[in-house]
């Protein structure tokens, strides 16, 4: 499902508190294009849940992951994948061929995610190219993200590609690759973060992967997020093949 087209036919997807949205396969994922918004505002007693049909019929378990795609927000905030002089026309393709992102609007607004859970996502769209639970690609600081959980994603829990978006109250549990990942000039803030690796899954990887830009280490803006009040609970595996480190 795509909300709007790239900088055209802008739309806002509104999801009511207590709603459950489910995907049937890896081809099912939600993309909010540049210029459009999502308004997913749940509550502590009525969160909005994005999950798989397997979860709905009770066949998901503690090791389930990758049963549907995930959520991708595409914004118009800066990324160092584009030169500063060309930010206004920046157009970078997001992971999973989800669409273009980037621009010269650091305060860009892609909507609201509040009291939202994302479970059992991260399908491998093409070989070695999985979707994250939530992908923030060029998402601006006008976007509100508060009380977000990503559970049992087969790739990263959340990943930031450039942008300036802030996140508060972030819970990342049982994700198989990095729980919190950023690259390409993300300069947002994260506060109140809990990361817990699945103690029974050898595929659990690092809690954090932090990059600037893989092809140009000195690219600006340099990735420089601020993180406060974080707890990381790693695994206790001792085999050489297992990743037991918190970071």
Question: What are the functions of these language-model segments?
Answer:
Residues 1-247:
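Beta-strand/loop edge motif enriched in small/polar residues
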